[in-house]
Amino acid sequence: MQTKEFLQQVWPDQGYYCVLGKDQQNVVVPKFINSIDEAIEVVNKLLSDTQDVYFACSTYVEPTERKKINAKEQRILWLDIDCGFDTKKRKWKDYETKDAALVALRSFTDTTQLPAPTIVDSGKGIHCYWPFTEPVDKAIWQPVAEGLKFLCAKHGLKADGACTADMARILRVPGTKNYKDVAKPEDVTVLNQGTSTPFDELARLIPIHLTDKPKAKRPLDEATKAILGNNSSK
């Protein structure tokens, strides 16, 4: 699966796309474009400059900022599974190895009956994508993404929950390099090409989760005020 084919699978047809490069000083620069062909040109230029290359999962209304309020549509659900040993935190990440993560992912899809996802080896972990046959509005996508996060927790699949439901998330572009260790860059490659599924079919397999909103504060009646010693003059 080539880079262009991957982007065609995961990006909606409408809106602005965003590709980002991160240089060796960790400076991240976003580039908004309005075609996949132009995105490929940007990816190749960043790769030739020895930069880490990312794509924004959403499309955007305006080519201005990569924030939730500016997001337009989604065409994927995703998971970010970290693997290996975190030398800074001195502990193992989600899984010790990528093979262990893939075994856990297979068990998860078997149990939940979710289709086999498109799987990307990010160099240091595993990225999973469930593409839709059609894009959906961000308001429709959000509760299903939250549901996927809770489904992972329910069945014990370790993944970055904050990433799963983050409308403005960026992830690595396949066909590029992971330069976290500049001396030993690792390839970002597609391990499995999943099939696009109608959004409604995926949503039926995922318990919808609506983020709880704070309840409106009810005014106290006079009897309750008296019991609590509530003095309205305070």
Predicted segments with their positions:
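Signature for HUH/AEP ssDNA processing cores
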Residues: 1-124, 131-150
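C-terminal accessory nucleic-acid interaction domains of nucleic acid-metabolism proteins
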Residues: 4-12, 73-74, 153-234
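Flexible loop/turn segments at secondary-structure boundaries
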Residues: 126-127, 180
